[in-house]
């Protein structure tokens, strides 16, 4: 999504070229051009490749686009189609962790045709049963642990098939400013939309907000009601309810909640987007059209969103009403992660006049956003790698290097090269060069220190030790 008054920062948009097509209604309402990679035609969704989407599913997409109120009462046959299940299976990560049943991708594939046919038949006659997800944890930047759920392999397959079918409907409904976990969209496009929106519109105040524990507090009752606006096939709705009620298995104990959707399965991001489409997106769109007098910019990525306002009083009014809106659906803004700050083209000048120093910054999708100037002295939004992200990545890298310290130097060098390339691909945006160089240098230093502290026998050659990272 791009502001029509400015040019896209194309260097941070993924390499995939944009689709050709007409604007969808949501983005016309945004007053911006069509997003690169958005889906105006019904030739996809891209959770799977275009060639894997049969004409029957394209007809579902076309019907959804023609009538925004149509409820689809016959969808399950798209889900239990053996070919679609096979494509879903092959799209899974081969080395992904197994669920509570221990079934792996490779073992399941030894009798793939027979297993998929059996799965299809169970789905068809209503005998399919969802299993609890296995609890796993990954570290967060603040040192805490983020809980995830690992579904069993067959649940992964069926969820992916359901997501493909439902995307054919919901991708015609979702609004242009929603970017998180959608086919053909990416964090870089959200960053692009935000930067161009702040630069091209009369933005003077920025609301940086986060919904507290969204994935844990999402209300199942409301979610089912929202789904039933479009999905009239009770068999598909029951499938979703089975996953919601399957529970979590941790230390041999199964727990079930009437709230939340476990992060880890492919269905959770779609359910989150459906929930926020009705709770947040449609409401924000209506508020902006009917109550805002100045410019308003909005970009949402899952439960994290940033909004730009021309007038402070409108931003404060919106924030008050947003809290009330979310409370009606069991949600609340995170008090420590929600801020209204002066940010925009005139922020530095205004704050200097009041003796308040430089404008505050805000973080979004791994970048710290800063009011800056171009080489010609014009206003621009600078984006630097978040310090916490930078430090957390280096800390993880040190742990991994210690684990690999006895491996041959070329093998470790190849690993570090992949780390640096991956970092550059995400954080390599204009005017972030110094942070990129600093990261590369820090990676090299970490490797050099660990090798210098290791016994000579642990390295095949010590002549190449030094402070520079490989590649």
Annotate each PLM feature.
Residues 1-471:
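Non-catalytic terminal/accessory segments
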């Amino acid at each position: 999504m791009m502001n029509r008054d400015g040019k896209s920062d194309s260097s941070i948009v993924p390499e995939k070229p944009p689709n050709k097509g007409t604007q969808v209604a949501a983005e016309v309402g945004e007053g911006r051009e069509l997003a690169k990679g958005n889906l105006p035609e019904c030739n996809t969704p891209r959770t799977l490749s275009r060639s894997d989407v049969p004409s029957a599913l394209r007809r579902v997409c076309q019907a959804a686009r023609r009538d925004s109120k149509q409820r689809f009462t016959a969808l399950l046959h798209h889900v239990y189609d053996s070919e679609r299940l096979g494509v879903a299976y092959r799209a899974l990560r081969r080395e992904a962790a197994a669920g509570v049943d221990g079934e792996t991708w490779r073992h399941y594939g030894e009798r793939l045709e027979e297993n998929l046919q059996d799965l299809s038949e169970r789905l068809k006659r209503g005998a399919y049963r969802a299993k609890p997800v296995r609890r796993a944890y990954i570290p967060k930047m603040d040192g805490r642990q983020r809980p995830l759920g690992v579904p069993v392999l067959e649940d992964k397959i069926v969820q992916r098939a359901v997501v493909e079918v439902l995307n054919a409907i919901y991708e015609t409904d979702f609004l242009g400013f929603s970017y998180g976990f959608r086919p053909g969209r990416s964090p870089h496009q959200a960053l692009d939309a935000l930067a161009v929106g702040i630069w091209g519109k009369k933005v003077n105040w920025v609301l940086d907000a986060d919904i507290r524990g969204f994935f844990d507090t999402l209300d199942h009752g409301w979610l089912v009601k929202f789904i039933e606006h479009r999905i009239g096939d009770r068999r598909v709705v029951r499938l979703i309810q089975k996953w919601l009620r399957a529970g979590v298995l941790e230390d041999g104990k199964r727990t079930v909640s009437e709230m939340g959707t476990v992060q880890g399965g492919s269905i959770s991001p779609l359910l989150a987007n459906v929930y926020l489409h009705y709770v947040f997106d449609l409401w924000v769109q209506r508020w902006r059209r009917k109550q805002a007098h100045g410019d308003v910019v909005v970009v949402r990525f899952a439960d994290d969103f940033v909004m730009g306002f021309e007038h402070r009083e409108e931003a404060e009014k919106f924030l008050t009403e947003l809290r009330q809106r979310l409370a009606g659906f069991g949600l609340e803004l995170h008090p420590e992660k929600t801020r209204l700050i002066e940010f925009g083209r005139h922020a530095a000048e205004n704050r200097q006049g009041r003796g308040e120093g430089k404008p505050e910054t805000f973080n979004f999708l791994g970048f710290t956003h800063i009011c800056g100037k171009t080489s010609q002295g014009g206003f621009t939004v600078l984006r630097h790698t978040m310090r916490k992200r930078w430090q957390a990545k280096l800390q993880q890298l040190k742990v991994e290097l210690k684990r690999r310290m006895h491996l041959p130097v070329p093998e470790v060098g190849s690993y570090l090269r992949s780390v640096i390339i991956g970092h550059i691909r995400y954080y390599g945006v204009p005017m972030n060069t110094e942070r990129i160089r600093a990261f590369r240098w820090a990676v090299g230093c970490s490797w050099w220190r660990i090798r210098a502290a290791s016994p000579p026998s642990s390295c095949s050659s010590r002549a190449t030790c030094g402070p520079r990272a490989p590649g």
